[in-house]
Amino acid sequence: MIGAWTVGEQTTEELLAGLPIPAPVIGAHPGVYSPSVDSALLCRAVLGELDRRRLDGRAETTVLELCAGSGIASICAALVGATVTAVDDTAEALAAIDGNATANGVAVTGLLTDVRALPASVTADVVIANPPYIPAPPTASAGHAWDAGDDGRDVLDAIIDALPARVRPGGGVLLVQSDVCGVDQTVHRLDLVGFSAAIVDEVPLAFGPVMASRAEWLEQHGFIAPGQRTERLVVTRAVRDAEV
């Protein structure tokens, strides 16, 4: 976990305990983002999406997780029968994904690359991501797993812009982010690239240590209201047609 964050840890545990399958066993791996509230939200979302596809008669589904970190969402998908590829840009994360998948008795294919350099041939029925999304001042350091440029959208926008080539016909997308970096912007950008989108899940949360440490900077730059110390973590679901 990113430091002591009692509210976040409690919410993470509650979300994982409420999954329709037993929560995956995830080991501690130095240098790799540990499962947190956003990770648990993505797990819940992908399991719901795969269940929806099964009910629609699409039992065989490929899943591509971008910015996979520990691989917990990929492992959830694999546990219910999906064929899964997990992408991250650090060797530490790839080792964690492999180790965690093995510990849970599933196969997850790992790819070591930046999502912006992912070959066009890598596609899937369902693309999921919990990317870095925290706005970061120029002086920020050591925040590879959560910092995402001065507006928090560097990685998120790159993922969205590549979706038309990444998502197979009839497929969908699940993205997790904080409302601090612009949920409406995400929905609008998805619309621009040909996807209908809607918010399908959210959790209000007190700031964790990273957000709290730069709250004053976030206030000064208009990301949060004066005195605000809470955020909403949201899941956006997008599809190629009007059914969201």
Which positions does each model-derived feature cover?
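SAM-dependent Rossmann-like transferase core, predominantly class I methyltransferases
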Residues: 2-80, 96, 219-243
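Residue-level signal for inorganic ion chemistry
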Residues: 39, 130, 159, 173
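Conserved SAM/SAH cofactor-binding pocket of Class I
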Residues: 43-122, 126-129, 135-137, 145, ...
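Short strand-turn motif at the edge of the Rossmann-like AdoMet-binding core
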Residues: 132, 176-179
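Glycine-rich S-adenosyl-L-methionine
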Residues: 142-168
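Conserved beta-strand signature within the Rossmann-like core of class I S-adenosyl-L-methionine
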Residues: 170-176
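Conserved S-adenosyl-L-methionine
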Residues: 180, 195-206
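Short, electropositive alpha-helical surface patch
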Residues: 181-195
